[in-house]
Amino acid sequence: MDLKKYVTIVPDYPKEGVQFKDITTLMDKGDVYRYATDQIVEYAKEKEIDLVVGPEARGFIIGCPVAYALGVGFAPVRKEGKLPREVIKVDYGLEYGKDVLTIHKDAILPGQRVLITDDLLATGGTIEATIKLVEELGGVVAGIAFLIELSYLDGRDKLDDYDILTLMKY
């Protein structure tokens, strides 16, 4: 199935010059959303995953159905101040400054094999920060899966040591 047919390109959003990849038009078609999810599930089965981790918010949209299909848990990575219990955190750079990602301190057990999911790989900053959180808790990043990769931003270069699946490349 050509998943790109179901992604809407929105010009000049959220700012001029950006060609935003809107996945809601993929997700609102059950058979297409299921197909994309199933592709990630098949990839993950080979990795013997214990837990799926995804950064907010679209990492949840991808990761939760994958975790459900695999019969494993899902641990959210959120911006600072959004998780109610004790967390660990990591600062990471954005094109316009810095932000902080957090995960519950007890979300991952040492040695657990983790699949990280997100909708889009751009510069790699968010996933690089997510990897740091997983590894700080003793998790093993067994794989990383994205719906979309923006190849021209070279985000994959930051992730050389990891196995990556992308379903669509632009």
UniProtKB/Swiss-Prot annotation:
GO cellular component terms, A-Z: cytoplasm
Enzyme class: transferase
Transmembrane segments: none
EC number per UniProt: 2.4.2.7
GO process terms (BP): adenine salvage; AMP salvage; purine ribonucleoside salvage
UniProt keyword terms in alphabetical order: Cytoplasm, Glycosyltransferase, Purine salvage, Transferase
Catalysis performed (reactions): AMP + diphosphate = 5-phospho-alpha-D-ribose 1-diphosphate + adenine
Domain of life: Bacteria
Signal peptide: none
This protein's pathway: Purine metabolism; AMP biosynthesis via salvage pathway; AMP from adenine: step 1/1
Compartments reported by the entry: Cytoplasm
CDD domains, sorted: PRTases_typeI
Database matches in InterPro entries: Ade_phspho_trans (IPR005764), PRibTrfase_dom (IPR000836), PRTase-like (IPR029057), UPRTase/APRTase (IPR050054)
Pfam families referenced in this protein's UniProt entry, alphabetically: Pribosyltran (PF00156)
Assigned protein family: Belongs to the purine/pyrimidine phosphoribosyltransferase family.
Subunit structure: Homodimer.
Role summary: Catalyzes a salvage reaction resulting in the formation of AMP, that is energically less costly than de novo synthesis.
Protein name as it appears in the record: Adenine phosphoribosyltransferase
Gene: apt
